[in-house]
From Swiss-Prot:
Sequence positions that bind Mg(2+): 8, 54
Catalytic activity, reaction form: apo-[ACP] + CoA = holo-[ACP] + adenosine 3',5'-bisphosphate + H(+)
Annotated localization: Cytoplasm
InterPro entries the record matches: 4-PPantetheinyl_Trfase_dom (IPR008278), 4-PPantetheinyl_Trfase_dom_sf (IPR037143), ACPS (IPR002582), Ppantetheine-prot_Trfase_dom (IPR004568)
Originating species: Roseiflexus sp. (strain RS-1)
Name used for this protein in its record: Holo-[acyl-carrier-protein] synthase
A matching Pfam family: ACPS
Xref: SUPFAM superfamilies: 4'-phosphopantetheinyl transferase
Stretches of the chain forming a coiled coil according to its record: none
Gene: acpS
Listed EC numbers: 2.7.8.7
Length: 138
């Protein structure tokens, strides 16, 4: 089994400034409709999900798609962080993020989110199956 990790921390004020400056244009470019509904305008929650997207991108070994991005990048909305019935955060991948996870033989991604003292943080951990490890060339 192989384990991949990613971590990100963001100042909540940075996300607040982006929302104030760009409004719905920013929010709809970065977050899925389900994330927008779940966060209900709470900046702390939006910031935690920003950190989640960055943390997952790091474990995938890619950047986030924006101006001047490389072929090894994913769109922000390709990484969606919602909650399960028990309130635990979950990650759903689509598009280029899902394709990259398949390349890495990732079976599951767990994520933890937190925000306090003006910061939001996310830690993401992904694992592959033992069978996928046997297929790797090293």
């Amino acid at each position: 089994m192989t384990v991949y990790t990613g971590i990100d921390i963001v100042e909540i004020a940075r996300i607040k400034r982006a929302v104030e400056r760009w409004g719905d244009r920013f929010v709809q470019r970065i977050y899925s409709p389900a994330e927008i509904a779940l966060c209900a305008g709470r900046i702390n929650s939006l910031a935690a999900r920003w950190a989640a997207k960055e943390a997952v991108a790091k474990l995938l070994g890619v950047g986030m798609r924006g101006p001047g991005s490389s072929a090894h990048s994913v769109a922000f909305r390709d990484i969606e962080t919602l909650t399960d019935d028990d309130g635990r955060p979950t990650v759903t991948l689509s598009g280029a993020a899902r394709a990259r996870a398949r390349e890495l033989h990732i079976e599951s991604i767990c994520i933890s989110l937190s925000h306090d003292h003006g910061l939001a943080i996310a830690v993401a951990v992904a694992s592959t199956s033992p069978a996928a490890r046997r297929r790797m060339p090293w």
